[in-house]
Every structure is written in C-alpha cells, then in structure tokens.
Amino acid sequence: MRAWYFDELPGHQKLPHMGEPVPNQKVYDLGVKHWKIPLDGHEETINQIAKERDYPNRDIINISKEGLGELYDEKMVYFFQEHMHEDEEIRYILDGTGYYDIRETPTDKWIRFQIEAEDLVIIPVGIYHRFTLDEGDYIKSIRLFRADPKWVYMYRSKEMDVNPYRLEYLKQTKEKLGLPVAPAAVGWGAWLWSWITWSKL
C-alpha cells in the first residue's frame, strides 16, 4: 500500500493528486487496517476475519461503467462525498485499483492511499473518508457486512461532528497518538447528538 497527502490542486478526482509521501504506519495509527492476502486461497482467510469481526454476510461489487451502468456517474459523485459510517467498511480487492482518502487527526488534511488486488482494507467506524476509482476506471471487491447491506453514508456536517461514533473515534485516535482529549467531550457530544435526533422527531 502506498499513501500520500492529497495535493489539493485542480484536477479530476481520479488523478493521483500525489503530494508528500505518508508512512503506512501513520495510516494505521488513524485506525485503518490493511492486509495483503493472495488471491489463491483467499476465501479461508476472509472467512476467518469475517468470523472474528462478526461480519457474516458478503457480496461482490463491480465498480465500473459496465458494472454500474446508468448509475455510474451518480455513484462516482456519491462515493466521493466526505462521509463516515457507524460500521466498519471492509473491502477485499479482487481486481482493479482505486483510492481511499481519509482525514488525518488532528490536521484534518486528506491522506490518500491506493488499493489494488489482494488488499484487504478496513476503514474504521467514525472516520471521515471518501472513495474514488483511479484512471483505470474499474475495481472489483468483496464487501463484508453484519446485516442486510444498507450502506448508510453519514455526510460530514456540524451535526455529524458530534455523532457519538465520531467522537469515540476521535477519542481513541488522539489517545493512540498521545494527543490531549477533552474529558467530557464524548459525554457532551452524546447528549447533544440525542438532542439533535429528538428535535427532528
């Protein structure tokens, strides 16, 4: 896996936008997990990881013009909007290539890393991220999930910034990085999130 800071220069999202290199350890410190699993016999390893993390269901997705058909352009915009999930995002790449962008704590800079065949990637709960194909315009992957796939995208907003899953992610990440954590941040955020949710009823 290769990682670098997204250069923020004009240009299509599928271009590398390659800025300063980022050590893989920095990506791991932000909660991303990565394994290289050979395609030959990958089923056994995937089954073991799915069992350990309690993800009993899976499907295969082909992200390409051919695979998505008329939904292709819409999905490219959809995947690239900054968002988080309340479940891990687990992908095992069977073929093709693409990019994940994740927000660095505490700078909020984008870090981009490329994924390719034989990569198993877990994007943690609560991290802001986005995905795009690269210029190859194709990726095929296995998706693991706990229940019927809903693929709920929780787009970044002031409301989402106080989501309990988001606050817990920040707390754990800052502790891992040795950064100060406000003692009451998670509790206050959970209360505010409850109030926001209640006010919408």
Curated annotation (Swiss-Prot):
Broad enzyme group: oxidoreductase
SUPFAM superfamilies: RmlC-like cupins
E.C. number(s) listed in UniProt: 1.13.11.54, 1.13.11.53
Residues holding Fe(2+): H83, H85, E89, H129
GO aspect biological process, one term: L-methionine salvage from methylthioadenosine
UniProt cofactor(s): Fe(2+); Ni(2+)
Pathway: Amino-acid biosynthesis; L-methionine biosynthesis via salvage pathway; L-methionine from S-methyl-5-thio-alpha-D-ribose 1-phosphate: step 5/6
Keyword Cytoplasm among UniProt keywords: yes
Gene Ontology MF terms: acireductone dioxygenase (Ni2+-requiring) activity; acireductone dioxygenase [iron(II)-requiring] activity; iron ion binding; nickel cation binding
UniProtKB keywords: Amino-acid biosynthesis, Cytoplasm, Dioxygenase, Iron, Metal-binding, Methionine biosynthesis, Nickel, Nucleus, Oxidoreductase
Binding-site residues for Ni(2+), renumbered to this chain: H83, H85, E89, H129
InterPro entries: ARD, ARD_euk, RmlC-like_jellyroll, RmlC_Cupin_sf
Superkingdom: Eukaryota
Catalytic activity: 1,2-dihydroxy-5-(methylsulfanyl)pent-1-en-3-one + O2 = 4-methylsulfanyl-2-oxobutanoate + formate + 2 H(+); 1,2-dihydroxy-5-(methylsulfanyl)pent-1-en-3-one + O2 = 3-(methylsulfanyl)propanoate + CO + formate + 2 H(+)
Family: Belongs to the acireductone dioxygenase (ARD) family.
Function: Catalyzes 2 different reactions between oxygen and the acireductone 1,2-dihydroxy-3-keto-5-methylthiopentene (DHK-MTPene) depending upon the metal bound in the active site. Fe-containing acireductone dioxygenase (Fe-ARD) produces formate and 2-keto-4-methylthiobutyrate (KMTB), the alpha-ketoacid precursor of methionine in the methionine recycle pathway. Ni-containing acireductone dioxygenase (Ni-ARD) produces methylthiopropionate, carbon monoxide and formate, and does not lie on the methionine recycle pathway.
Protein name: Acireductone dioxygenase 2
Organism (species): Coprinopsis cinerea (strain Okayama-7 / 130 / ATCC MYA-4618 / FGSC 9003)
